[in-house]
Amino acid sequence: MLIIFISFFDRLLLILLIASKMTNTLASITYEDDITIITLDDGKVNAFSYEMLTQVHRLLDQVPQKSGALIIKGRNGIFSGGFDLKTLASGDLSKITKMIESGYNLILKLYSFDRPIIAAVSGHAIALGLFVACCSDYRIAIDGKYICHANEVRNNMAITDQIMEILKERVNKKYFYSAIYHADPFSVKDAIDVGYIDEVISEDRFMERVNEKAKELASLPHPFYANTKKIAQKERRKKISVSIKKYQIQTSILRAILKLKFW
């Protein structure tokens, strides 16, 4: 009787463990020949919480660095809604700064990635979600009533140096005021002129075109792609790295001050 009970308990524990892992999977990785696909899917708006960012960082470490190409895609209707608003509104300085720092590091990692990246913009791309797409070599959006929106200014936030360096390179000067300073949203089709998106493809051909472009860019030889990119991005990478370091120092000082007790 005891053996049966233990066996039942073990099976129940295993089921709960599997269910827990399934629930906590916010990003996944698959491989198709020389193409790696990272899929963002939190079941909601693909908010970049600290947990999702941590998972994406780990998955990026599993992507081949000397061959192939990487596709980053979202779930149906949403690429990503940006940083997790619940964390930002929590008032927990430690959680907020950890999440933001991880987001900045993700931007630098993607921007300087040694292999080509294709962003499969499967829906709305907002704030950090849009900036992640902007770090990619090529951005293909699904056709539909979706927007690309750097909405920081309209949400009482300033776009920081770490992000601005990417936007300076990507956004068409003609649209810089409206897209960045005025925080105007753009349809995915209009986002082509802005510089956010390269192509808009109908839903029935979306992933076919994404895979086609990924295979094309996967043929770029190593290390010549990576070395050329490194030379071109040298100053911008340095500026982003310095800005991240400055953020780390500032937030560590702030946390230390808040821990002090004044009597």
Task: Annotate each PLM feature.
Residues 5-73:
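Conserved CoA-thioester-binding segment of acyl-CoA-metabolizing enzymes
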